[in-house]
Structures are given as structure tokens and as C-alpha cells.
Amino acid sequence: MSKDFILAVDQGTTSSRAIIFDKKGNIRKIAQKEFTQIYPKSGWVEHDAMEIWGTQSGVMREALEFGRVKPDQIAAIGITNQRETVVVWDKETGDPVYNAIVWQCRRTSSICDEIKRDPQFVKYIKENTGLVVDAYFSGTKVKWILDNVEGAREKANAGKLLMGTIDTWLIWNLTRGKVHATDYSNASRTMLFNINSLEWDKKILDYLNIPESMLPEVKNSSEVFGVTDSHTLGGAEIPIAGVAGDQHAALFGHCCFEKGMAKNTYGTGCFALMNVGDKPVYSDEGLLTTIAWAENGKPTYALEGSVFIAGAVIQWIRDGLGLVRSAEDSEYYATKIDSTNGVYLVPAFVGLGTPYWDMYARGTIVGITRDTKREHIIRAALEAIAYQAKDVLECMKEDTGLDLAGLRVDGGAVQNNFLMQFQSDILQSEISKPKVNEITGLGAVFLAGLAVGFWKDKQELKSILTTEKVFEPQKDSQAVAHDYRGWKKAVERSKAWAECYS
């Protein structure tokens, strides 16, 4: 039977998804299932790793069944995943020793504070991992599990525990424990991987007291990792041939193959990446240096700005405040008024990312008067997403010396035309939205397809990607500058709140 499709395994922060693509990049079928968000304490976020695997394997089977595609028609699987979220499990039983600790979780802030007391080590971490010391990354989360779960430290020292980001956890389960591996992009998000030597960093592992025996093998983003176990997907042994963290996969899906090309993904968080070529560029502006992907042992590097809360602020005004019935309603209410009337919402629910890196910042609404209505709050929430993206992209301009020559966008929130137009206005730049909104999944299948010869080369990939809509700035630069100054003042009000008032 001909291999006409590639299956994207897209494991996100709030849902597990499976997407079947054909050779022209068309979507045959999407299946999706949300899973439980666990909040044991203020600032703590967890997932049940077994529920992640259960929902992910379920939607894979559902996509095949309802897409009327047989497993042996799948040429390869590409995996893309929420990054930094980490699982520690028993090597023999495959059972997690604790819930997955999610990238948003701030429980290891005190561990990070301890590291920051050693400026030389902080410098070492930045120069060798490309990251700042923050609870966002996997390394301190693993240390917390080993230090706080009964018996975990002893088992780890005895070589009985494994760890991995979500891609590694899925590969382990898809292959029934035959493959314990990750790719360069996911490894570069752990704060444990040396992006210069391309090895796990022994100095950092020793500092955090994490045994190297727990760590997965690191492979190219476009490479056959192994095949699915015959019991996993209807008896077929399908090559797992592409793996990348969600933001890296999106950069690849946008065909940002040349130095200086950039994209912004609007999901739970908001993430901008710029391709900086085959050598790392280190930021003076609070950006992260990361590995975008690797092919044939050669990494492509990127600068990244990370915003922790983007689309999640719309979930909050829907579920937490009850201001809208659906996320789509936010656009309707935002366009009922001409402006926020001076209201700003800073969604620092779990701290602030680039360029502030303030673990203790908390959510703030400023500028409220007796005239403030729910429309103003809703519009301010949407505008906050765009302002945070501008914070990041301004940093990229400073670090690279390049003006933003348009921005490629993707993610659920790009369906909100108000947000995209406001983003174009506030950046004073063109915004391009592709026809395929599932760009993260597309990036994963592009990587997998190249590895198995499904597509010939990157030039062929470029011919598949087409633009649906372009947004041009409609607001003058003086008005933009005035509004942006207000945002910066609002951010100042949110900083260090938990530190001062906890």
C-alpha cells in the first residue's frame, strides 16, 4: 500500500492532537482531546503524564479511523510538543514517579534564587546553554522531583529512573520502551544541554545533582528515531522521523530557513523565534539563545523571546471571570469600543518572561475608572498579547541590528482579526498568516518527511506553504508610541509583586 500521508503528533499544554497531512500539505484529519490541568498550590502547574499518553494515543487512533487512513499508509510520524515540561519515570515499570511538572510552574523559584547567588555560574549557564536561570526550564524541575519525591533520589542514583521532556515520554511509549531519546531543540530547553559542545553539560548536572544516566540520547530533529511498537497503531511499525519542540517546529513549518527570518506563535504562551544561522547569537536584551533544529549533526540556532501567558489570558477572562462565553466572542466585544480608554491588563499570572524575567511579577489591571466596562477589560486582554510580542521583537531588533521585515504568524489566536490588526499596528510591520494554521504540526511532518524521502528538499517545502492574509499597519507611529509607553508603565506596576506581598 502506498505511503501517502504523514502523521503529526502535536502534544500541547492544554490538549493532545493528531493531524494527518498529505504530500501537498493538506490536512486529511485532525483529532484533539483536552486533558486535566492540575494546580496543587499557587504558581504550581502539573499534568498527569499517563493522561497525556492516553489522550495522545487516543487521538492518533481517532485521526486514522475518522480520516479513513490505514496505519500502513503513514510514511512517518513527526512529533512536536510543549517544551520544558518534564517527566521522571521508572525505567522498569514505565510509571511516572510524580506528575509532569509543566513549563509554567514556578515551584523551583527558590532553587533558581540559590543559583543566582553565584554570578559566575549564572554566566556559565547563559554562555553554555543559551538560557537564563529561571523556573521555566526543565533542569530545576528534575532536581525538585529528586529532592522531594520519596525514594526518587536513591532510585536515580541507582540508575533506575529516566527523565525526559514530553517528546521523550511519547517516543518511549510509542516504542514500548525501546527508545529513550530527544532531539537537539528539546534538549536545548532543559538548561542541562551545552549548545556549543552539543552534549549534556556535566558541570550543570553535578551542580543540580542530576545523574547523567537519567538523560535521553540526543538526535537530529530530522532523523529516524525508531519505529512504533506493533501493538501501538494497528500492527504497523511506523518510523518516528521528525521531532522538535513546538516553537522550533513552527519556525521550520513557516520555512524560515534563512538567517533573519522570524515567526511568532500565539498559543497558551506567545513565542517569537528568529533564525540566526549556524552560530549562536547571545542576547543583551533578555532573549534566549536556542537550537532551532539540527540536521546531519549540524544545528541551526535561533533567538527566542518567551511570553508565558498569551492565549491563556483569553481562557482566563472566559473561565475565570466569565466575561465571554467563548474565546471567539472576545473579538466581538473588543471591536465594540474604539480603545481601552487607558486600561491595561498585564497577564503576569506566573511571572514575566522576555525581556523582564521576573518570577515574582503577578497579573495587574490598571487604569480602571467608573466608566470601565467589560469590553475594556476584554480588549485590554487581547492588546496585552500584542504588547508582549512587541516587547520581544524590539529586543530582537537590538540584538541583531535588523529591522523587522514582516512577521509570519500562527497559532489559535491568529484567527482573531482584531488581534492581528492590532499586532500589525503596534509593530508598524506587515503580518503574514499562512493558509495552513496548523503550522506547528506542519513543521513536524516537514522534518519527518525529509528524513524518509517523502519530500525531496526544502525548496519543495517552500512551494507547499501559501499565504492566506496579510495585515498592514493602519495606526500612525505617534499613537502607537503613546500606547506602548502606557503598557510599559503598567508592566512596572506588576513587577516583584509576589516577592513584596507574599
Swiss-Prot record:
GO cellular component: cytosol
Any GO BP annotation: glycerol-3-phosphate metabolic process
Sites where the protein binds ADP: T13, R17, T268, G311, G412, N416
Domain of life: Bacteria
Listed InterPro entries: ATPase_NBD, Carb_kinase_FGGY, Carb_kinase_FGGY_CS, FGGY_C, FGGY_N, Glycerol_kin
Keywords tagged on the record: ATP-binding, Glycerol metabolism, Kinase, Nucleotide-binding, Transferase
EC class (word): transferase
Activation and inhibition: Inhibited by fructose 1,6-bisphosphate (FBP).
Main function: Key enzyme in the regulation of glycerol uptake and metabolism. Catalyzes the phosphorylation of glycerol to yield sn-glycerol 3-phosphate.
Name assigned to this protein: Glycerol kinase
